[in-house]
Amino acid sequence: MERPFGCFFILLLISYTVVATFDDEPSFPENADLTKDLEQKCFSINKVDPNLKFENDRLKRAYIALQAWKKAIYSDPFKTTANWVGSDVCSYNGVYCAPALDDDSLTVVAGVDLNHADIAGHLPPELGLMTDLALFHINSNRFCGIIPKSLSKLALMYEFDVSNNRFVGQFPEVSLSWPSLKFLDLRYNEFEGSLPSEIFDKDLDAIFLNNNRFESVIPGTIGKSKASVVTFANNKFSGCIPKSIGNMKNLNEIVFTGNNLTGCFPNEIGLLNNVTVFDASKNGFVGSLPSTLSGLASVEQLDLSHNKLTGFVVDKFCKLPNLDSFKFSYNFFNGEAESCVPGRNNGKQFDDTNNCLQNRPSQKPAKQCLPVVSRPVDCSKDKCSGGSNGGSSPSPNPPRTSEPKPSKPEPVMPKPSDSSKPETPKTPEQPSPKPQPPKHESPKPEEPENKHELPKQKESPKPQPSKPEDSPKPEQPKPEESPKPEQPQIPEPTKPVSPPNEAQGPTPDDPYDASPVKNRRSPPPPKVEDTRVPPPQPPMPSPSPPSPIYSPPPPVHSPPPPVYSSPPPPHVYSPPPPVASPPPPSPPPPVHSPPPPPVFSPPPPVFSPPPPSPVYSPPPPSHSPPPPVYSPPPPTFSPPPTHNTNQPPMGAPTPTQAPTPSSETTQVPTPSSESDQSQILSPVQAPTPVQSSTPSSEPTQVPTPSSSESYQAPNLSPVQAPTPVQAPTTSSETSQVPTPSSESNQSPSQAPTPILEPVHAPTPNSKPVQSPTPSSEPVSSPEQSEEVEAPEPTPVNPSSVPSSSPSTDTSIPPPENNDDDDDGDFVLPPHIGFQYASPPPPMFQGY
């Protein structure tokens, strides 16, 4: 047996060696440039049979290139390359020879045409050896990979067509090195990246780029192009149509369809008097049609459909001398000349469907048209049409103040004492329902006088739309006056807040949404933030309560948030604030206060500011006293009690949170948290005002932070303190709010856990907090105190709580407990039974 096996093994080795010898392929790097060294290597690797005779050396080089290419072909169903054998390369299928341009006595390979051969393979670097190649057509095959750099040697290239294949990578810049190139067709591949501006500096007659993955703006050098046909269709080009387009005197056809282009049409389009096809459909163009459009004297096909164009389609556009087809459907035109009505134009094809035209069939519903038609884009101020403002980018959405991702904002745990200024991170009160409530002043309940020196809210800081950026760092407000949450009021996301749901998005009705091209709601953008508000719905639990929650607490909390900053979860909560959004009825309160105390704590103080802005201001005062408690936030929860006492100032707002439960409540919002993210902006929703306080996101950080962090870190105590803050202004409101909070606490059975001992800390300050008027009652607002107790369920939920972040209650609940807190240890009796579902479940009539 051994001998037969040994013989078999030897035979196997011999056969393998023979196959390898015949199958030896050039070892050229795939994308190598064809330097002289590599050329020499190519000749040595691709040894030519000495028996083959060639008319000249150029045909020999072509033979080497074509044989290397044949080896790079994996599938040839039509046997197109089957006869690529022997030295007569001019007889190969798809290969064309002609006299050399520099020496007509020499025959060279001048062209390759393998169109529609369904060949699969790639392009080897050896193709660079065919230096006399002027025509290269391989469209409608299955070639893949990249266009090798070695093709830069093809200096005579005149037509390069690789369309309808599977090429990838960046724009093939080798094409920029061909001085004689006139026809460039890259259609239907997978090229990506930006379009080099140099492409329009070349003397090209046709540029086909459609159906790839290019994503960039259209270079302004397009005006230098002498091309007669240019197609950008079905890519991801964005921005404006360059105004230099008016300089393209040779242009006959230009196609922009299926991109993300925006803004108004530049007036220079009217200078294209030789254009026969102008297609700008399926983009995001806005505004009215420029009057210069009547300058398209040669246009035969004009397609502006599926955009967001408005205004009146005038008679002169529909009576262009050579016009055969004019499509302006799926826009927001609200008027058209009689000559533009389909069927009344002597056989011309007009399409006006899905607009806002009266007495015409198949139009958009009125509620979808109204938002767009009532606020048309002023193209005189649009950068795309020459204005200075830049309307092209559809009005920038109100800065999203990055929903102040509270969590990350690492609240700069402001040293409780110092931070007196609750420079709540300027959380954009995006949702801040009606952040305007600069009324914060109300929050600035002087009550903060609470000995804890509720963080001076610097008189409810006028919600300055503080830049959300800061939101993270809530510089702890000085306990003085209920934290004057300088909420960065993102104010006027406020709108969205009040009707969180409505706020969400542009309103389904928003024409933009309706219009196929939803991409760019140029005008509506601002609403975008609103959109977030809607998400709060989850938090909706007990929407009414939210309003109370919103009360000032948020500001106060801002300081505590720092403590929480550590726990990212709070950020999550930020969304909960949206929950508060439900309260829209009393939008103001919900917005501000809720966000801060609950979840937001993590966001750190940032949110707190927003709370103030909300109308809640009054409630805040009552809570503000609690702030003292909050001050503790910086300290770890374990110390909270003590800290609270010391840091009360910061905590002032904390009092509200003191009911840590609220923080837990926030957890309840957890559901809201899910929606939170979307909702963050709209704290309005019941879910704890936390989010509502536009700063919602920020509030989230602030209010809850303490609690949430408490879970994460002992710092809970600070959290509690924040609760008081909420009481800030109107103790009465606060008390109301508390009720919600308590309810919320109940619903969020989780609450129990949240509060951790730290909550107690608020107690010391609780009175101050409560008293927005000194009287702690407001602060405690019996219900809230209950809430606090529920939180007692200590840390267990903590982790979860942070996620809930909503804890709308937090802000408000503190009041009652605050009274208890005054004792210093009001370990919230764990209402384990209750789920802190959207904290603000407590629903006050009218909210």
Swiss-Prot record:
Entry's localization field: Secreted, Cell wall
GO MF annotations in UniProt: structural constituent of cell wall
Post-translational modifications reported in the UniProt record: Hydroxylated on proline residues in the S-P-P-P-P repeat. O-glycosylated on hydroxyprolines.
Disordered: region residues: 381-847
Disulfide bonds: none
LRR repeat spans: 45-71, 106-130, 131-153, 155-178, 179-202, 204-224, 226-248, 249-273, 296-319, 321-343
Glycosylation sites: N260, N274
Biased composition (Low complexity): 768-783, 797-811
A GO BP entry: cell wall organization
Main localization of the protein described in the UniProt heading: secreted
Biased composition regions of type Polar residues, renumbered to the chain: 667-682, 688-720, 726-752
Tissue and organ expression note: Expressed in flowers, stamen, pollen, and pollinated carpels (at protein level).
Signal peptide location: 1-20
Region named Contains the Ser-Pro(4) repeats: 522-847
Sequence intervals crossing the membrane: none
Pro residues bias (residue ranges): 485-499, 533-642, 838-847
Pfam families documented for this protein: LRR_1, LRRNT_2
Keywords associated with the record: Cell wall, Cell wall biogenesis/degradation, Glycoprotein, Hydroxylation, Leucine-rich repeat, Repeat, Secreted, Signal
Gene Ontology CC: extracellular region
InterPro entries from the UniProt entry: Leu-rich_rpt, LRR_dom_sf, LRR_extensin-like_regulator, LRR_N_plant-typ
UniProt key word Nucleus: no
Sequence ranges of Basic and acidic residues compositional bias: 438-484
Function: Modulates cell morphogenesis by regulating cell wall formation and assembly, and/or growth polarization.
Protein name per Swiss-Prot or TrEMBL: Pollen-specific leucine-rich repeat extensin-like protein 2
Organism annotation: Arabidopsis thaliana
Lineage summary: Eukaryota, Viridiplantae, Streptophyta, Embryophyta, Tracheophyta
